[in-house]
């Protein structure tokens, strides 16, 4: 905790960078930047300590590639789960939710379903963060900027002034209104997707016993599964070195366009097991076994952001969920945050990037990332429709559904974020050839 009224640099550096938000993306970004001694990096987190929800998060091949490029592969592999032999390449097996009938599998060769417990992953990243970078109890309440600097203000009366402010502060971002002023872009707020997600964690052995008692295969506990049905689907995958199984059961209201969350309803609530079981009444034996093992589920109202017109305003940029929050149906949210972190950290670490041209660098980042992140938002929402027999041109046609599931992730997974870096640097060399460096 910094005691004085302003967080200031103590030694001259090539760039001073303030990061708002200490989630997985923000901390990974800070770790990557901290390896360059010419960068002054300060991270501000509203909470009194780093913390993440106790849930699983899955990564596709593109996200695993970003983790490697960020230099976090060893930390990740120590805690990551993967599909057991002979299912190493399976991302998910897809089944009919009414009777457990196997439909197909989505394969990610060499990676399969790579997953971790969120809190464990954040802890592993934090272990690589040098002391003195993180500041806690720093809730951002506003951002402003001048010609040669940007300033973030916090609710404890302190401020940070630097060359760059990066908002990695989530779907309820305090930095976003500065980047997209309401008077120019209208009020941009998260909207309910129409989907509730019931979450729970089950000890793996308990689920294996429950599955066998229902006449189902116990391997369904260890191989990632997706059970599909009309307006509903359930996913499972192992975490904590296969000690636990992460479960998320989704239900979507498609009765009206753009459904609204009841006024005043909390986004996350503890609910009864009976409510959850009622939602999935009549589903398969395996699904009943899974849900009966969750005595105290939580229900999440899944929110997302519209596709934003821009992510940057001069020296201020938003990334991760602050810029492109999405529903989790492609397991892509954390991966996009990590891609963002790698691409921008690499650009800012280039010796040619300095205070006088950093706005141009942020603009180049936006140019190479905007269309991809918007497409991930859009297709993540569409994926939920596909899984719940509501996909456009697919519906409940299982032959079309299978074709879609076997190919829909290739463009997402077969992406190397270093190509974004190359494209951005090529753009910068062209646009700033007279004054770069």
What are these regions (language model features)?
Residues 2-17, 46, 50-53, 57, ...:
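Conserved N-terminal glycine/acidic-rich loop preference
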Residues 3-15, 87, 93-94, 100, ...:
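C-terminal helical "tail/cap" subdomain of flavin- and related membrane-associated enzymes
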Residues 16, 40, 244:
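Residues at the starts of beta-strands that form the adenosine-phosphate
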Residues 17-20, 140:
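A generic "structured core" feature
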Residues 19-36, 44-47, 166-167, 198, ...:
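Conserved mid-domain beta->alpha element of the FAD-binding
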Residues 29, 53, 145-146, 175-178, ...:
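Short glycine-/acidic-enriched loop or helix-start segments at secondary-structure transitions
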Residues 53-128:
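Active-site-adjacent segment of FAD-dependent monooxygenases/related oxidoreductases
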Residues 111-112, 116, 122-294:
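Conserved FAD-binding catalytic core of PHBH/FMO-like flavoproteins
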């Amino acid at each position: 905790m910094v005691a004085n009224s302003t967080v200031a640099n103590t030694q001259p550096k090539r760039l001073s960078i303030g990061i708002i938000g200490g989630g997985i993306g923000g901390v990974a970004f800070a770790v990557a930047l901290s390896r360059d001694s010419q960068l002054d990096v300060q991270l501000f987190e509203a909470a009194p300590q780093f913390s993440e929800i106790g849930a699983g998060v899955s990564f596709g091949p593109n996200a695993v590639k970003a983790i490697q490029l960020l230099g976090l592969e060893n930390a990740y592999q120590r805690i990551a789960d993967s599909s057991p032999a002979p299912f190493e390449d399976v991302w998910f097996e897809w089944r009919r939710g009414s009777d457990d009938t196997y439909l197909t599998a989505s394969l990610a060769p060499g990676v399969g379903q790579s997953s971790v417990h969120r809190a464990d992953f954040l802890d592993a990243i934090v272990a690589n963060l040098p002391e003195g970078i993180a500041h806690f109890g720093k809730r951002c309440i506003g951002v402003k900027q001048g010609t040669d600097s940007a300033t973030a203000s916090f609710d404890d009366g302190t401020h940070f002034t630097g060359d760059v402010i990066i908002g990695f502060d989530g779907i309820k971002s305090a930095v976003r209104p500065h980047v997209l002023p309401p008077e120019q872009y209208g009020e941009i707020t998260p909207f309910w997707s129409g989907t509730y997600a019931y979450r729970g964690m089950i000890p793996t052995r308990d689920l294996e016993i429950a599955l066998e008692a229902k006449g189902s295969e116990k391997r369904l506990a260890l191989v990632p599964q997706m059970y599909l049905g009309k307006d509903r689907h359930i996913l499972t995958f192992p975490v904590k070195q296969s000690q636990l199984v992460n479960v998320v059961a989704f239900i979507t209201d498609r009765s009206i366009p753009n459904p609204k969350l009841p006024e005043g309803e909390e986004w996350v609530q503890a609910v009864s097991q009976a409510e959850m079981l009622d939602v999935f009444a009549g589903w398969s034996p395996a699904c009943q076994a899974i849900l009966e093992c969750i005595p105290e589920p939580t229900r999440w109202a899944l929110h997302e952001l519209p596709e934003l017109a821009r992510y940057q305003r001069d020296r201020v940029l938003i990334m991760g969920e602050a810029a492109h929050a999405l529903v989790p149906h492609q397991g892509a949210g954390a991966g996009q945050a990590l891609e963002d972190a790698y691409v921008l950290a690499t650009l800012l670490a280039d010796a040619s990037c300095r205070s006088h041209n950093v706005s141009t660098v942020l603009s180049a980042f936006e140019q190479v990332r905007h269309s991809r992140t918007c497409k991930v938002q859009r297709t993540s929402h569409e994926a939920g429709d596909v899984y719940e027999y509501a996909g456009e041109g697919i519906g409940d046609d299982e032959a079309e559904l299978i074709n879609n599931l076997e190919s829909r992730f290739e463009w997402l997974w077969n992406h190397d974020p270093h190509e974004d870096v190359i494209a951005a640097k090529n753009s910068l060399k062209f646009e700033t050839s007279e004054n770069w460096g």
